[in-house]
Amino acid sequence: MIPKHLLIAIDHVGIAVPDLDDALEFYASTFGLHSIHEEVNEEQGVREAMLAVGDSGQCIQLLAPLNEESTIAKFLARNGQGIQQLAYRVTDIDAVSATLRERGARLLYDVPKRGTSNSRVNFVHPKDAGGVLVELVEPATAD
């Protein structure tokens, strides 16, 4: 089991969308949610936006593909627009990854990669997480 002090919150729910600008307009006009951060992650092949949900600290992450080879483009082709991932905020991604591997879970990366806002991220394979793509997010530290 992962110790409580390592897994501290739901960070965000990731939603795959074909067009980020259209999705931002929909979430603003329908739910009153606005982007608090946008970036392009070339390594992961996505343009993304984080939308705060009130003052909860949790976000909706909208993910649009940059090209046909990106994971998000493949997800959209297979499943259409919709929830792509559930992300947990962790305090030590290396410790959480080691614990999960000891329990037999497969992680997608050998070492964490750069995520949104210079966070460190890894993913638990859906077959080892009840059919859900679970993202582990260790926020960047303020320097």
What are the roles of these predicted feature ranges?
Residues 2-6, 49-52, 60, 88, ...:
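Vicinal oxygen chelate
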Residues 24, 39, 94-97:
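Generic structural signal for individual residues within well-ordered alpha-helical segments
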Residues 56-58, 68-69, 93:
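Short, charged/polar surface micro-motifs in flexible loops or helix N-caps
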